Amino acid sequence: MKFTSVLAFFLATLTASATPLYKRQNVTSGGGTVPVIITGGPAVSGSQSNVTTTTLFNSTSTLNITQLYQIATQVNQTLQSESSSGIIIVTNWRSIETLSFFCSIVFNTSKTIVITENFLWGVPILSSSDAEGRGTLVAGRDKVVYSGVFPPYTVPVGVLSGQKNVQWFFDACEPTLIASNSTIRTQYSNFTSAQISSNASSGTNTSSSSSSPLVPIIYEEGYSQSLIQSLSSSIQGLVVVSSGTSHNSTVASWTSVDFPVVYASDGSSGHDGSGIGFISNTSIPQGAISAGYLSPIQAQTLLSIAIHNQVTSSSELQQIFPVSQQ
């Protein structure tokens, strides 16, 4: 079951994204305008006032790294407007985790970025003056506001009170991983570039670090030497979902592979189906990198961003994953 899912994901990510559809719709009434980017999910109702929508995709599957950077380009254009206090990005439920974490890393801004399945859930958040300076936020259907840096729906930072107000649980602050003095912000400011190389859409066979990296996720118990050999010529990085402690690992060492390998813990496999896992440097095979508290999908996203920006050495990657900050 898991191996089939991995192969399906692998094949899906091999497919280049289609040229995005840019469709603008203005829904007006008095007052300020709420900018909304649609990448999937329900359509914006034409009766809703003060909303300007830009439709990039109508995706029902998980957004790939090329699509994420295309979204980033559009978001940058919107955030550069002096009249913009932030933006709402609507996506499908499968992409909530990937998109919210990607935006957390790529956008170094105090302006509010809200990721949601329904733009109506994001409007009160964007309208709140206290939303700024918290990093990317996720608006859930349960009326709770979550941090986009952590696995989805695990770290609440506020709750909708009524239909228009947000009750924040604490004063605005950014998570350590993306704080202004963090390693990512001080040493890897190029991560905030929203541009993807033109090589990503060209027909030339260039280095993956200058195009769209392919970073699949596999489960440790499904590991086999033949699987790695079949993937090694096509992938630029790998995320392994840990099966437990180091003495249970089916792999002794990853030092012989020529791509970075990150081990992550799946907190969603807990008894309640959700949560935050953690894996330390002492719980992984030699040559691998620990994702710390990041979920497998978040580890995949951060590793893809790093490879895209030509950060591939083990020493550099160890600095940007949160386990180094423990």
From Swiss-Prot:
Induction: Induced at very late stage of sporulation.
The Asparaginase/glutaminase domain, residue ranges: 19-324
Keywords: Glycoprotein, Signal, Sporulation
Residues annotated as glycosylated: 26, 50, 58, 64, 76, 108, 181, 190, 199, 205, 248, 281
GO terms under biological process: ascospore wall assembly
Statement: the UniProt record of this protein carries the keyword Signal: yes
Endpoints of the signal sequence: 1-18
Function of the molecule: Serves a protective function during the early stages of spore wall formation, and contributes to spore wall maturation.
Similarity annotation: To yeast YGP1.
Miscellaneous remark of the record: The program of events of meiosis and spore formation reflects the sequential expression of at least four temporally distinct classes of sporulation-specific genes, SPS100 and SPS101 genes define a distinct class of very late sporulation genes.
Protein name: Sporulation-specific wall maturation protein
Organism from which the protein derives: Saccharomyces cerevisiae (strain ATCC 204508 / S288c) (Baker's yeast)
Gene designation per UniProt: SPS100
